[in-house]
Curated annotation (Swiss-Prot):
This is Serine/threonine-protein kinase mos. The keyword rRNA processing does not apply. ATP binds at I77, G78, S79, G80, G81, F82, G83, S84, V85, K98. Suppresses the mitotic cell cycle in oocytes, forcing them to undergo meiosis II to produce haploid gametes. Acts as a MAPK kinase kinase (MAP3K) that acts upstream of MAP kinase in oocytes.
Length: 351
């Protein structure tokens, strides 16, 4: 089923944005014009955003929007708040297929989650799991599915596996991969809003991390006095990773992702679950009113990494570094282990 209208892309449309869907042969390609959020329709390699990666992948018979008969489901990989993920096949390749759960109490939340994943078709980056296709938005009531590249197990599974090493070198590498994904996403004006180990896929062949699950993502506007593109407070991620300003009901910014990123880094360091066994309401009150954070280990012997963690989960939005600042520090870290604390000196700005 081809994706023929711009209505399906309404979440990314604005007065100055025009998003068009065109066809090249039998491949649907998305072009974004006059957009302040998407400056070009091609990535740095000259590939159209909507095209699948070219690693032995034949696009010729694949569409951005598909019917239920165009893919198959073979087995369950896992499940989450808004659906289950299955192993499947699409265009002759093994893929991950996410089924969006239709919540009877809040159907609009399910629809918006699917719409956010649909819009992720536009995102193309080596550290982001590619969304290859979706069922059409108009077919939501008969079953909503998102088809993604299959990469491997998630970071949460690695954290939970005592046989999997998370050495300082590997932690740093994973931290770099994740922040590259966030830097790209934020540069497109989008906050992920559900950054956590379960949403980071680690390629079993290359050991490269890729950010997944954009079901909570929102286009945001940074700056004082400017609200987010749309208010969806019930789609702001998992509470233990949620930034305090979101717990207060404030509009999200990209700095909310930095807070969640900090908790994710903490989890790689400790291999523990944040606030495990604690009452949710007590934790939320503690995070918001008392600056409660997960406990750092006393003998981790990784001061620079702990410095990064604590800077990322600062209570004030303005005190957290940006993804660009963290990316620069981590890239320099590979050459000079003394750079990180200096590069992440406290910066004050606009909340």
């Amino acid at each position: 089923m081809p994706c023929d209208t711009a209505d399906n892309w309404a979440r990314y449309e604005g007065q100055d944005n025009a998003i068009m869907v065109a066809r090249r042969g039998s491949v649907n390609s998305a072009f974004v014009t006059n957009s302040s959020q998407y400056h070009q329709a091609e990535d740095t390699n000259g590939n159209c955003f909507i095209n699948a990666r070219n690693d032995n992948w034949d696009n010729r018979d694949c569409n951005a929007c598909v019917g239920h008969s165009d893919f198959s489901i073979d087995g369950v990989i896992g499940s989450g708040g808004f659906g289950s993920v299955f192993l499947g096949r699409y265009c002759g390749r093994r893929v991950a297929v996410k089924s969006v759960r239709q919540c009877s109490r809040n159907k609009e939340a399910s629809r918006q989650s699917f719409q956010a994943e649909f819009n992720a078709l536009l995102l193309r980056h080596d550290n982001i799991v590619s969304v290859l296709a979706t069922t059409a938005y108009e077919d939501f009531d008969s079953g909503a599915f998102i088809i993604m590249e299959y990469a491997g197990r998630n970071l949460q599974q690695i954290v939970n596996d005592p046989g999997s090493s998370l050495s300082p070198t590997r932690r740093t590498k994973y931290a770099l991969h994740i922040i590259r994904a966030l830097h790209y996403t934020h540069s497109q004006g989008i906050a992920h809003l559900d950054v956590k180990p379960a949403n980071v896929i680690v390629d079993s062949n290359t050991d490269v991390c890729r950010l997944a699950d954009f079901g909570c993502s929102q286009r945001v506007s940074e700056g004082e006095g400017r609200d987010s593109f749309t208010s969806r407070s019930y789609l702001t991620g998992t509470f233990a990773y949620r930034a305090p300003e979101l717990l207060r009901g404030r509009p999200p910014t990209t700095k909310a992702d930095i807070y969640s990123y900090g908790v994710t880094l903490w989890q790689m360091l400790t291999r523990e679950t944040p606030f495990a066994g604690e009452n949710h309401h007590v934790v939320i009150f503690g995070v918001v009113a008392q600056n409660l954070r997960p406990s750092l280990p006393e003998n981790a012997n990784d001061a620079w990494y702990e410095s990064l963690v604590t800077r990322c989960w600062e209570g004030r939005v303005a005190d957290r570094p940006s993804a660009a600042e963290i990316l620069l520090a981590l890239e320099r870290r590979t050459d000079d282990t003394e750079n990180l604390p200096r590069d992440l000196k406290r910066r004050h700005g606009t909340t």
